[in-house]
């Protein structure tokens, strides 16, 4: 019974139903995670670009040199952050997201406006269950 109980409980948890959970939001729409979901913040590219362009001089040549230094000193971590941020924006667009926050399950079901990811997933799972 002790071994069967955790497995039985897992069957009823929202995470057990959802194979792929994506949260699409921005810094103005906080949310409560359930763990394991992918996060796409649509304003992340802008925040990274703001870091790169912070306190640049008015001289275009100096500004260009500083940005190049910042890009090279950021190394692969910065490249990974930029690529991931822009890939997230592309993925949200391809999923057809129209409002924030959005919780997407299995690239098919979407709940808009629910900041609690577990609650959004539970709503989707309730909808997916066979109706009597």
Spans of features found by a protein language model:
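N-terminal secretory signal peptides
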Residues: 16-60
């Amino acid at each position: 019974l002790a071994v069967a109980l955790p497995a039985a409980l897992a069957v009823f948890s929202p995470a057990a139903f959802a194979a792929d959970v994506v949260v699409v939001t921005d810094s103005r729409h906080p949310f409560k995670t359930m763990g394991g979901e992918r996060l796409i913040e649509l304003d992340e590219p802008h925040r990274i670009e703001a870091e790169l362009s912070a306190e640049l001089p008015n001289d275009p040549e100096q500004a260009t040199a500083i940005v190049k230094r910042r890009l090279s000193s950021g190394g692969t971590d910065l490249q990974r952050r930029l690529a991931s941020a822009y890939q997230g924006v592309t993925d949200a667009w391809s999923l057809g997201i129209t409002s924030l926050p959005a919780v997407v399950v299995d690239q098919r079901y979407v709940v808009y406006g629910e900041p609690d990811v577990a609650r959004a997933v539970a709503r989707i799972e309730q909808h997916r269950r066979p109706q009597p």
